C-alpha cells in the first residue's frame, strides 16, 4: 500500500501545523465567547483566557500573513461557523469585558485592596517602559490589567482620565501585531499618559469618603 504524504517538505509541514493551531484558537475563542454570554465563566477568568487567545492569534496570524491573508476566508474554507470568535479576534481585538466595561461597584471593605492593585499596576506599567519592554505582547497585558483594576473602583467616574486613556491605548495596540514595538515617541507618550493618569488617580482618592 502506497504511503500518502500530507506535505512535501518541512516548510509545508509547519504551514499545516500552523493552520491546525489557528483552527484551534478560533474554535477555543468561539467556545469561550459562548460560555461568557451564558454566564458559565466569571468575567475575570474570561478576560484572562481571552487575552491569551488574542495574543496567540496575533502572533500566529502575523506568521501566516502571506499564506492566510484573510482570516474570514480561512474560517469559511474550513466551514468553521465561528462568528463570535471572528468578531473578537479580527474585528474587536479586545475582550468583551474591556470593550464593554461595566463599572463594578466596590464595597468599602475591599476598596483599599483595589486601590493598592491600581497603584501596583500603574507602577508596573511605567517601570516596564523604562526597561524598554515595548513589544505589543509585553505592553498590552499590563495596560489591560490596569484598565481592569481601575474599572473595579466605584469612586472613579466612567470618564476618568485613566480609564479613557487606557481604553484608547488598548484599542491602538489591538490593531498592531504581537511582535510590533512602540516607537520611542509612542513609548514616551504612553509613559506621559500613565504618569498623568496616576497623578489624577491619586488626587481622586480623598474623595472616597464623600
Swiss-Prot record:
Disulfide bonds: none annotated. The keyword Protein transport applies. It is found in: Endosome. Component of the endosomal sorting required for transport complex I (ESCRT-I), composed of ELC, VPS28 and VPS37. Interacts with ELC. Component of the ESCRT-I complex (endosomal sorting complex required for transport I), a regulator of vesicular trafficking process. Required for the sorting of endocytic ubiquitinated cargos into multivesicular bodies (MVBs). Mediates the association to the ESCRT-0 complex. Keywords: Endosome, Protein transport, Transport. PANTHER family: VACUOLAR PROTEIN SORTING 28, ISOFORM 2 VPS28, VACUOLAR PROTEIN SORTING-ASSOCIATED PROTEIN 28 HOMOLOG. InterPro entries: ESCRT_assembly_dom (IPR037202), Vps28 (IPR007143), VPS28_C (IPR017899), VPS28_C_sf (IPR037206), VPS28_N (IPR017898), VPS28_N_sf (IPR038358). It holds the Pfam family VPS28. GO terms for cellular component: cytosol; ESCRT I complex. Its main location: other. This is Vacuolar protein sorting-associated protein 28 homolog 2. It comes from the Eukaryota. Residues 1-99 form the VPS28 N-terminal domain. Residues 109-205 form the VPS28 C-terminal domain. Belongs to the VPS28 family. One of its GO terms (biological process) is protein transport. The keyword ATP-binding does not apply. The lineage of its organism: Eukaryota, Viridiplantae, Streptophyta, Embryophyta, Tracheophyta.
